[in-house]
């Protein structure tokens, strides 16, 4: 059946502290005394500016190249300010591999969750796609990926072709997540549960479109699963979580 981690460590990069606090409080309340939840900081090493610049994706097929000095400097400034550059896409699995190298090796039994503003992509069908979450060690949730990853309603792309993207945002603002969306902390809770189920069972997703473990590919699916569904977890996963908690008690 699996087992819950004894400890969950949350990291934030470029996101407001209240985002991490919201996940912290939620998991603390959800899991009770069986799991310790705490916050930490990713301590980057001296390689970071070059490594991060070298992980930039240059094209739809995952093209990369030797970084320019200016790109390395931009990454260095971003690390100093704890504010990653906007609009840059990174190779998601390679980014995860680098972050993994910064974590203590003895902590693999713990669940590490990094919430970042970086745009992360992975290859599927020969094309790189922006991801909302990457599941592994550590698990990484991208707030920018939550906004840019799941496809927006078809109406959005029609407005974009007509040059009226801002008009669409004004009319249909509740149908898609936006950067700095006040609903993001609530959405992050559901994605943190996906990371939890991945760590505990190896199976983070659910086919029930109303379950917060549903793997949404469209914004309206994400909005429904995380914000509008009459229930948080489907009966199957609600019962599974209770069983996992008993095993941790």
Located regions from the model:
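Propeptide-to-catalytic entry region of secreted or membrane-anchored zinc metalloproteases
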Residues: 1-124
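Catalytic glutamate of the conserved HExxH
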Residues: 187-199
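Generic detector of ordered, mature protein regions
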Residues: 21-23, 40, 50, 124-128, ...
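Metalloprotease/metallohydrolase-associated module, dominated by Zn2+-dependent proteases
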Residues: 9, 14, 132-183, 200-249
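Generic alpha-helical secondary structure signal
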Residues: 18-21, 182, 186
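A contiguous catalytic/ligand-binding core that recognizes phosphate-bearing ligands
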Residues: 104-106, 116-144, 148-149
């Amino acid at each position: 059946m699996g087992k819950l981690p004894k400890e969950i460590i949350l990291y934030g990069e470029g996101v407001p502290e209240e985002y991490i606090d919201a996940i912290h409080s939620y998991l603390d309340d959800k899991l009770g005394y069986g799991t310790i939840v705490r916050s930490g900081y990713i301590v980057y090493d001296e390689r970071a500016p070059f490594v991060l610049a070298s992980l930039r994706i240059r094209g739809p097929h995952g093209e990369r190249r030797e970084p320019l000095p200016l790109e390395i400097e931009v990454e260095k400034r971003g690390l100093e300010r704890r504010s990653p550059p906007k609009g840059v896409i990174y190779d998601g699995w390679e980014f995860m591999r680098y972050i993994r190298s910064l974590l203590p090796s003895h902590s693999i039994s713990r669940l590490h969750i990094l919430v970042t503003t970086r745009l992360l992509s992975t290859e599927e069908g020969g094309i790189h796609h922006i991801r909302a979450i990457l599941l592994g060690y550590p698990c990484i949730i991208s707030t920018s990926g939550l906004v840019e990853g799941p496809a927006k309603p078809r109406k959005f792309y029609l407005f974009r072709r007509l040059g009226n993207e801002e008009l669409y945002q004004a009319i249909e603002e509740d149908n898609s997540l936006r950067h700095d969306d006040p609903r993001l902390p609530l959405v992050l809770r559901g994605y943190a549960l996906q990371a939890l189920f991945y760590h505990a069972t190896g199976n983070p997703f659910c086919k029930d479109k109303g379950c917060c473990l549903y793997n949404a590919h469209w914004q309206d699916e994400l909005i429904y699963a995380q914000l509008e569904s009459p229930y948080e977890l489907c009966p199957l996963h609600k019962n599974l979580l209770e069983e996992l908690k008993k095993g941790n008690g």
